[in-house]
Amino acid sequence: MKKFKALLPIFIFWASIFAQDQFNNEFDYSQIIKVPDLSFVNQVYTGLDILEQMDFRILENKTIGVLCNQTAVNRNGRHLLELIGTHSNIEVAAIFEPEFGLWGIDDKRTKLIGNDRIDPVTGAKIYSLIERSVYPPDWIMSELDIVLIDIQDTGVRYSTYIPSITKFLESASDHEVSVILLDRPNPLGGLKIEGPLPRTEYQSYEAYHLLPIRHGLTIAEIIIMVNEMGWVKDLKRANLMIVPMANWTRDQYFDDTKLPWKKPAPYINDLHTLLMFSGLDLFRGTNINVGFGTDHPYLWFGSPWLAAGYFSEKLDRLKLPGVEFKEVTYRPVGSPYYNRVPQYDGRSCSGLEIIITDQDLVKPVETATTIITLMNQLHPREFQWRGHDYIDKLFGSDMLRVFVAQKKPPSYLSPQWMHDEMKFSEFRKSFLLYN
């Protein structure tokens, strides 16, 4: 960090040059804030790091709202709200929190004053975009000049952060409020794409936009796509500005960036958990326990009726890339991640541990659909879909459920979404900010 601090005068010099024409007009409705070339510094800097080095000048004398959570930290682990709180000429009038809250489900640092939750650093009231309404209140939006957004996305379509930001763009458009989004890495890298595109009739918060399950985009690249393509309701566009990262490349996973890891969701403990989440979150649409009620969500799965030894032998014969399986016996007890009881709570489960042997080769969606297909074939009476075909919303179509019913070999399924992957890979090119 000392090397980068030494660059601060140079950075401000260039920032002042760009002050007259600081935006890239490559897009019709979205602007990229220009920052100096820092390629000679061998470190990744998030949009927050860049904004901090600009001394938050674009926010001076503005009334702002902030949409963020616990992941909005700089390279040194300091939170966005803490950093802004040191600037008396920036007024934070409202804080908006996505799913799982501002600080995560276990953190109680917000103050309760009457019925209002207050951030102790900025003194701003906190509004949830999940619990009562998916939109921010109209009366507070009418008071804002800018909404600042900083959230570490998962890189996986199931997450609700992108839908929440999309709803925010709609409200910002209605109230003519500018949106500044600070970019962060896709923790799963920017090269791999896996899974089908959702069909329109199956779109939901888990499949909100036309993205593969693993999309390989940063949060800014997705939101630019949403804004440019008119994917906001009624083709609304926001005055969107992006503070990009410096020195992130698409071949980098999160552990390559040397940035501090903050769980993007309370059940995602590390990068390997996140990798398997991109496939095994489909198990929420089945009666298979996916490690909830244990310390190994998405890396363990099982049930009281699974013949784990025989099932492991069948999986090993399929030679799924980048993974190995090991038998485990466990008893799920409660869950710190949701206010709900995990499947088979308190019951002994036979299961398998997923061991990632090569994160560059593993295909989590193919792994998950193979397990589901094989589970149905080996345990046709015990295996069940849950929640009125909830699996269709997670998957984005009824393709998986229909395929499982047809009893075809598991390896026949993934080629069916290969065309979607190729089509999306070509489509996304014009929205990529990084090489």
Model-derived features: where do they sit?
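Bacterial Sec-dependent N-terminal signal peptides
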Residues: 1-30
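Glycine-rich oxoanion-binding loops at beta->alpha junctions
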Residues: 112-144, 156
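Glycine-rich, aromatic-lined ligand/substrate-binding cores of catalytic
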Residues: 248-333
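Conserved functional hotspot residues or short segments at active or partner-binding sites
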Residues: 302-415
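Glycine/threonine-rich flexible loop motifs
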Residues: 153-165
